[in-house]
Swiss-Prot record:
<feature type="transmembrane region" description="Helical">
    <location>
        <begin position="61"/>
        <end position="81"/>
    </location>
</feature>
<dbReference type="Pfam" id="PF00499">
    <property type="entry name" value="Oxidored_q3"/>
</dbReference>
<comment type="subunit">
    <text>NDH is composed of at least 16 different subunits, 5 of which are encoded in the nucleus.</text>
</comment>
<keyword id="KW-0521">NADP</keyword>
<keyword id="KW-0618">Plastoquinone</keyword>
<keyword id="KW-0874">Quinone</keyword>
<keyword id="KW-0934">Plastid</keyword>
<keyword id="KW-1133">Transmembrane helix</keyword>
<keyword id="KW-0812">Transmembrane</keyword>
<comment type="similarity">
    <text>Belongs to the complex I subunit 6 family.</text>
</comment>
<feature type="transmembrane region" description="Helical">
    <location>
        <begin position="92"/>
        <end position="112"/>
    </location>
</feature>
<keyword id="KW-0793">Thylakoid</keyword>
<dbReference type="InterPro" id="IPR050290">
    <property type="entry name" value="NAD(P)H-Q_Oxidoreduct_6"/>
</dbReference>
<protein>
    <recommendedName>
        <fullName>NAD(P)H-quinone oxidoreductase subunit 6, chloroplastic</fullName>
        <ecNumber>7.1.1.-</ecNumber>
    </recommendedName>
</protein>
<comment type="function">
    <text>NDH shuttles electrons from NAD(P)H:plastoquinone, via FMN and iron-sulfur (Fe-S) centers, to quinones in the photosynthetic chain and possibly in a chloroplast respiratory chain. The immediate electron acceptor for the enzyme in this species is believed to be plastoquinone. Couples the redox reaction to proton translocation, and thus conserves the redox energy in a proton gradient.</text>
</comment>
<dbReference type="InterPro" id="IPR042106">
    <property type="entry name" value="Nuo/plastoQ_OxRdtase_6_NuoJ"/>
</dbReference>
<dbReference type="GO" id="GO:0048038">
    <property type="term" value="F:quinone binding"/>
</dbReference>
Length: 177
């Protein structure tokens, strides 16, 4: 989809704000249901990031798999938890909570200071996948595989890391209760 510059910029800012608000909602909201809905907002914004780059299949797959299946599964799992046990000792801070918040804050500060100083225009993106696709020797599923392993490798791996962290958090919560 070829959008004019101002509309494309507005869309990116809007989706970025959705990312930030959803991420803050996941971390800061005390109700697990609202936290899961905020995760759904983050995943919807992730799928909408693919539409300006003409990757409608990846956007639809992201929406169906992550929002339609994973987030609904998380919401059902949270609904089956006993809420009274979850909130009983919520106000107490431990040493582990302090260390975790210190590590997260240091990672956040390092990212905030590193990202603006990075020369993103110096990164050489691969053109091999475009050469393969232009030959019309492969079918659509092979084209999707090539795009996922070249052009969209970073977002694909980032969402897998986010899901791994969520799974580890769910397992640790389940072991506590």
């Amino acid at each position: 989809m070829d959008l004019p510059g101002p509309i494309h910029d507005f869309l990116l800012v809007f989706l970025g704000l959705g990312f930030i608000m959803g991420g803050l909602g996941v971390v800061l909201l005390t109700n697990p249901i609202f936290s899961a809905f905020s995760l759904g907002l983050v995943l919807v914004c992730t799928s909408l990031f693919y539409t300006p780059s003409n990757s409608h299949f990846v956007a639809a797959a992201q929406l169906l798999i992550y929002v339609g299946a994973i987030n609904v599964l998380i919401i059902f799992a949270v609904m089956f938890m006993n809420g009274s046990e979850y909130y009983s000792d919520f106000h107490l801070w431990t040493v582990g909570d302090g260390v975790t918040s210190l590590v997260c804050t240091s990672i956040f500060v390092s990212l905030i200071t590193t990202i603006p100083d990075t020369s993103w225009y110096g990164i050489v993106w691969t053109t091999r996948s475009n050469q393969i696709i232009e030959q019309d020797l492969i079918n659509n599923s092979q084209q999707i595989g090539i795009h996922l392993s070249t052009d969209f490798f970073l977002p694909f791996e980032l969402i897998s890391i986010i899901l791994l962290v969520a799974l580890i958090g769910a397992i640790s919560m389940a072991r506590q209760y």
